[in-house]
């Protein structure tokens, strides 16, 4: 839906924020769009498995910066999330080295229990070319103080709420 490329990991498997503190899948992740449709085609799964290993290479950041040289927008994680802190460091470096590109990062890793991730994601959010969105665990319109983005039922008409129908 966004007019840009994205870099993804496997939904649920590589989303440690998709589980609550007891290890149960949070409501929003129980209906995750990235667990059906084109996301479950063999080539799509193969690409996400490749990405899971590829980011560990020393050349990853330099090559990613090169690939984004002509891009205006980029989305991190239409599936998956920043599972590893070292990956977060590399993503931050890519963002810093591509000021011409607007990065969008939806994430569940801003939960207080992921302290190291929170610190580096907050650094990302300070960059003028980065938009970080804390993805809600809820599907009933409730959200915590950490963010203001959530999933709501279609029949919900709360005053002051902007609905994105993407």
What are these regions (language model features)?
Residues 1-166:
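Class I S-adenosyl-L-methionine
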């Amino acid at each position: 839906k966004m007019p840009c490329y994205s870099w993804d990991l496997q939904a649920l498997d590589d989303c440690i924020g998709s589980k609550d503190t007891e290890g149960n899948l949070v409501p929003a992740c129980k209906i995750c769009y990235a667990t059906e449709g084109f996301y479950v085609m063999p080539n799509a799964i193969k690409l996400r498995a490749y990405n899971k290993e590829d980011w560990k290479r020393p050349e990853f950041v330099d090559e990613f910066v090169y690939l984004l040289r002509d891009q205006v927008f980029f989305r991190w994680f239409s599936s998956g999330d920043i599972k590893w802190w070292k990956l977060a460091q590399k993503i931050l470096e890519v963002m810093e080295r591509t000021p011409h590109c607007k990065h969008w990062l939806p994430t569940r890793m801003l939960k207080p229990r992921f302290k190291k991730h929170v610190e580096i994601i907050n650094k990302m959010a300070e960059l003028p070319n980065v938009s970080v969105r804390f993805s809600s665990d809820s599907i009933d319109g409730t959200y915590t103080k950490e963010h203001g983005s959530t999933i709501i039922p279609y029949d919900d008409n709360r005053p002051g709420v902007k609905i994105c129908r993407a």
